[in-house]
């Protein structure tokens, strides 16, 4: 299996989070994008501020590697209008894919109409501009029943408003990789959670983010029906190695 075409190679830490300078962060992003281009990874996933730079790098290399960014990251509690403004700026900067953090807290509080409205508006903006859209549901905060319910909500909003013909361009994604769990519990994709997402979001696509640390696990995810894998160790996984990175 050519696992490279399933990999979204990812660097999302801010300079403060990584304990490095802004220029060092920019260099890390450049390294990630170059690595994605050289290894023909499906996509490089980066913060919005780096989209323009990354786009220029991909153009210069005449590469098919896509550029993706995160919206409403990482808490997901931004007002919908703020998420849409951030997404529109990324579109203006020539991003290929938009990974929104859904307002999972609102979902847990029973504010279903708010979540439906957000999913509709965010998806419409992306699809109207020929961008793939992913909805991060942050599985570490959800029960299995909530994973099922939120996956079904996103699926139903997309199918009811945009039709099955757009299902291949919308994903339910597991995790941000930034949620802090207690007692060493995983904050990224698990096989159990991804099985629930795949079964309850199809015909939409599914992205497993975080927690995949080796080639065999990546292949197992794909065979389960996962169509993208977000990881900060794409090269290690592609080369058949194992990583201790949490995302």
Where are these regions (language model features)?
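Catalytic cores of alpha/beta
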Residues: 78-93, 142-153, 194-204, 212-227
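Short, flexible/disordered intra-domain loops and linkers
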Residues: 18-23, 180-188
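Glycine-rich, proline-tolerant flexible connector loops at the mouths of alpha/beta enzymes
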Residues: 33-53, 98-116, 138, 172-186
